[in-house]
Swiss-Prot record:
Gene: COPT4
Entry GO MF terms: copper ion transmembrane transporter activity
Expressed in which tissues: Highly expressed in roots and at lower levels in leaves, stems and flowers.
Protein role: Involved in the transport of copper.
Pfam family, one: Ctr
Name the record gives this protein: Copper transporter 4
Keywords associated with the record: Copper, Copper transport, Ion transport, Membrane, Transmembrane, Transmembrane helix, Transport
Family as reported in the entry's similarity comment: Belongs to the copper transporter (Ctr) (TC 1.A.56) family. SLC31A subfamily.
Taxonomic lineage from the root: Eukaryota, Viridiplantae, Streptophyta, Embryophyta, Tracheophyta
UniProt subcellular location: Membrane
Membrane-crossing residue ranges in chain numbering: 53-73, 106-126
Keyword Transmembrane among UniProt keywords: yes
Membrane-related topology note: Multi-pass membrane protein
Amino acid sequence: MLSSKNVVVVEAWNTTTTTQTQTPHRPSLLHPTFYWGYNCQVLFSGWPGSDRGMYALALIFVFFLAFLAEWLARCSDASSIKQGADKLAKVAFRTAMYTVKSGFSYLVILAVVSFNGGVFLAAIFGHALGFAVFRGRAFRNRDIQ
């Protein structure tokens, strides 16, 4: 039943007698735990590859994606829009900012799924600094008395 070319898998919950054939496991860049090396794949096939400079660029890119996601979250707040603006324009602006923020956030999630420890830390620090700068109380002028 077991050969070097294919593996026969029988599903335990399948009541019929059919089987599936699968190719043997191939090594890949996906890791089941955090990987702390610079040879990884983030967001795109083959990027950043095994170049340390490109890995540093990937970390900076993920950091700024997370940072900008926090800025866009602040832009989509109701308090960031002028009081006299048209209600439909307010809703359209907030919806557009929320949509772009969601796209950036999903890109950050996809980058973190690479299971690279550096990418994870870049995403966390980008979100933390972005929150502190754009939504934290420390940098708001109206909260300072």
